[in-house]
Amino acid sequence: MLEAVEIIEVSPRDGIQNEKKLLSLDSKLELIDRAVKAGASRIEVTSFVNPKKVPQMAQADEICAALPRDTNCQYIGLALNRRGFERACNAGLDEVNFVAVASDTFCQKNQGMDTDSGLKLFNDCLLYTSPSPRD
């Protein structure tokens, strides 16, 4: 029997990444604020990707710098490569998520590498991380 279910709000990242009209920084922060006020305890706020490929994620660093820290909410960023991982680690987030892709074709299209390279990168980044919590 399942003892608990954890819901992660992903609309500030996944919900807007394919939108044609670019959202302002204020609009993105308002979306996050509304999720916090609605009771979300974990929010994937952005993705640290190339803004030329995903223009909606161009303000990842600015979003993280403006997040309210007086909440019980955990903020999460998505990283697809080492540069994104390093940016996410420096952004003051509570957590960095990775994507593990089963298909080489999709992994190449989404992350610019094959699945084995993606898993190796994930492992390398795990070795880099520290178990100490954010101050």
Label each residue range with its predicted role:
Residues 128-135:
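Conserved small/polar residues in nucleotide/adenosyl-binding loops
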Residues 6-10, 43-45, 75-77, 96-98:
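Hydrophobic faces of well-ordered beta-strands that scaffold small-molecule active sites
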Residues 83-90:
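Catalytic cores of alpha/beta
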Residues 13, 48, 78-83, 101, ...:
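Active-site beta-loop-alpha junctions enriched in small/polar residues
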